[in-house]
Amino acid sequence: ASTGRVVAHETLSRIRREDGTLMGAGEFVEVAERMGIIHKLDHLMMEKAFARMAETDYQGLLFINLSPRVLVLGEFLRETSRLVEFYGIDPGRVVFELTERDTVRNFQVLEDFVNDLKLEGFKFAIDDFGSGFSSYHYIKRFPVDYVKIEGDFIVNMLRDGRDRAFVRNISNLAQELGIRTIAEFVESEEVLEAVAGTGIDLAQGFHTGRPSETLTPAEAVPPAEPG
């Protein structure tokens, strides 16, 4: 978080209305889930993202948010593996993430899904880490590569010592386990400095980069080593 290097991007889904304005994911994801077509949107988004990676020879990581519905879709991994092979993408540079609140519904299904994900060479991240009651159980049970720390902890770090303590302890534990940490909602230089001071590996937020249709050249991230 202290080097200023770009090493990753996260995909964001948007739909352009007829008047040219953009509709955010929060406006259509739930509708797509109810209609049973969210997996089709996920597939379309991934195909566009992988094509862009191939066109630009992008070398960084790409984080992709998953709907919990994919956990029960057997064709998801087959289709995703087919896409990365078609576009010549190293699956180790693709990180699929689920929010912590989405992981609590069926541990066995999630465990099977993550293990299959890892067998195909992809990476796995837990988003909003620390927002639920089972955070540490996840990183004990699942082969997690990244944890994205709940943004509320990050935005309050400068004025709340308890939040700083939470972030520091998550960072220390993750380092011991060989898991990389990402601070979300980093929106000022002061917060970035505070995050770097706790040993967090990567930072994400408006201060480090805003949504864009282009891929900023990125460097490869070396693997984390257990402490």
What are these regions (language model features)?
Residues A1-V7, R14-D19, S67-G74, R93-Q108, ...:
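EAL-family c-di-GMP phosphodiesterase catalytic domain
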Residues F28:
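Conserved, function-defining core regions and hallmark residues within catalytic/recognition domains
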